[in-house]
Amino acid sequence: MIDTDGFRPNVGIILADGSGRVLWARRVGGQDAWQFPQGGIKESESAEQALYRELQEEVGLKAEDVEILAVTQGWLRYRLPQKLVRQKEPRCVGQKQKWFLLKMLAEDSAVDLIGGGPPEFDEWRWVSYWYPLSKVVSFKREVYRRALKELVAPHNSLLSGLPLVDGESLC
């Protein structure tokens, strides 16, 4: 499903542990290409349904293994480099994403990169919240910056242990 502007609807997943570190995964076959889990939204799915399906497929986690803390308000878009743009119809020039911030409720051992099909990642680790911004492939960097910035207040609530009020930490 690609919109009239050529963007494919997608979900991005920022999964944080109780210490505020986020799951960072290396793509299979990439030249040391690391990213957050993400994936397309099918025509019959809501963004939240796609989130849970992608979470299961990519890192083997179920809905009960996580808690949704926040989601970005609008779509965040990035354009693919020209060499990655699909030329056949419908032409896909990039992705438009809803980003979810999740809290991991399960033990680390619940992460299973084999998931429900061919693996997309071959390694994962916990990293600091802002670390991915300097490491992700350049064409995704601005979307990562915007998503991390928008979701930083609910992320910081993990560190303080305080509830959010109108999207802000009580610290």
From Swiss-Prot:
The UniProt record lists the keyword ATP-binding: no
**Listed GO molecular functions?**
metal ion binding; pyrophosphatase activity
| Keywords of the record | Hydrolase, Metal-binding
Q: Name one Pfam family in it.
A: NUDIX
User: What PROSITE patterns has UniProt attached to this entry?
Assistant: NUDIX, NUDIX_BOX
Motif Nudix box — list its residue ranges.
39-60
Tell me which cofactor or cofactors this protein depends on.
a divalent metal cation
Function, as annotated: Accelerates the degradation of transcripts by removing pyrophosphate from the 5'-end of triphosphorylated RNA, leading to a more labile monophosphorylated state that can stimulate subsequent ribonuclease cleavage.
Protein name (database record): RNA pyrophosphohydrolase
| Organism of derivation | Teredinibacter turnerae (strain ATCC 39867 / T7901)
